Amino acid sequence: MCAAGSFRDIRAAWQALLPPDMTPLAENEGYQAEMRRLTRELVHGNAVPKGDVATPLNRLSSAGFRIALLTNDSVESARHGLEQLGILGLFDPVIGADSGHGGKPEPHGLLHCVAAHGAKPGEALMIGDTNADFGAAQAAGVADFICIADSQDERPHSDVPVENVIPR
């Protein structure tokens, strides 16, 4: 869950273990502050790209493609990781699970990204590596889904066509 889930998923798992009369973690400012602190301390500065991401992203941008980032992490964490990799300027908007659009696999964040560029879902595609990414792409009705995976057998869902898999 920690690798494929969002902070919201982790919080929900912890909440289920707590006494029912305890303040929900989503409403607990102390918990929220501690999670922000831990994210800054442990996550920031530890971005590890899946191969050379800068070259293809720069090529897409130079060719006129508009690129957005949709993550189940926080916007702050995503922006910091992109900045660390030197590619933050390629993404607009950067949408996180904390942006008010819900998390993947819900389609709302992806639909917001598409609308931010004045496009329709059928004119967009999503590149991702998780079931949540694939689910968001399907729910939003984008034209296609490109999967980044170690191999065709490692794609997040069997409905992802093998020809849509780009090896890491």
Residue map of PLM features:
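A metal-dependent, Asp-based hydrolase signature
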Residues: M1-R40, G51-A54, R59
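Surface-exposed amphipathic alpha-helices with a cationic face
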Residues: A54-S62, V114-A115, F134-A139
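Conserved Lys-Pro-Asp/Glu-containing loop-to-beta segment of HAD-superfamily phosphomonoesterases
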Residues: K104-F134
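Acidic, Mg2+-coordinating phosphoryl-transfer loop and its flanking beta/alpha structural elements
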Residues: L125-V165
